[in-house]
Amino acid sequence: MMAEAKKAAPKKAATAASKDADAKGPKHTPPNPKVRGRRKTRIGYVVSDKMQKTIVVELEDRVKHPLYGKIIRTTKKVKAHDENSIAGIGDRVSLMETRPTSATKRWRLVEILEKAK
């Protein structure tokens, strides 16, 4: 007795709906789509204002350790553009991400939230 050859199932005809979906793009949306034009904003403290039109701001980030649950505090220093040189050391400021204005500057001063005493 000879084994019967398995026949491949006939291909289904493409429907109009699937053709439209292929033309528009993927059928699902990526989980976290990056919205164009959204810029990061951060709040930090000015630690240096000795450069012309530039301030150094210390940004603090608090992250919970995944295993032990301890809150870990990390800091990062960034340079920000201060057009009128109005911010001073110790001021609490709001920054916004921007296009690179120099080799190391990618942030700009939005407003001074609290002046140093």
Swiss-Prot record:
Disulfide-bond pairs as recorded: none
Gene3D superfamilies: Nucleic acid-binding proteins (2.40.50.140)
Gene Ontology molecular functions: rRNA binding; structural constituent of ribosome
InterPro entries to which the protein is assigned, alphabetical: NA-bd_OB-fold, Ribosomal_uS17, Ribosomal_uS17_bact/chlr
Region (Disordered): 1-42
Pfam families reported for this sequence: Ribosomal_S17
GO CC field: cytosolic small ribosomal subunit
Keywords: Ribonucleoprotein, Ribosomal protein, RNA-binding, rRNA-binding
An annotated GO BP: translation
PANTHER family to which the protein is assigned, alphabetical: 40S RIBOSOMAL PROTEIN S11 FAMILY MEMBER (PTHR10744), SMALL RIBOSOMAL SUBUNIT PROTEIN US17M (PTHR10744:SF1)
Quaternary organization: Part of the 30S ribosomal subunit.
Role noted for this protein: One of the primary rRNA binding proteins, it binds specifically to the 5'-end of 16S ribosomal RNA.
Family: Belongs to the universal ribosomal protein uS17 family.
Stated name of the protein: Small ribosomal subunit protein uS17
Organism for this UniProt entry: Mycolicibacterium paratuberculosis (strain ATCC BAA-968 / K-10)
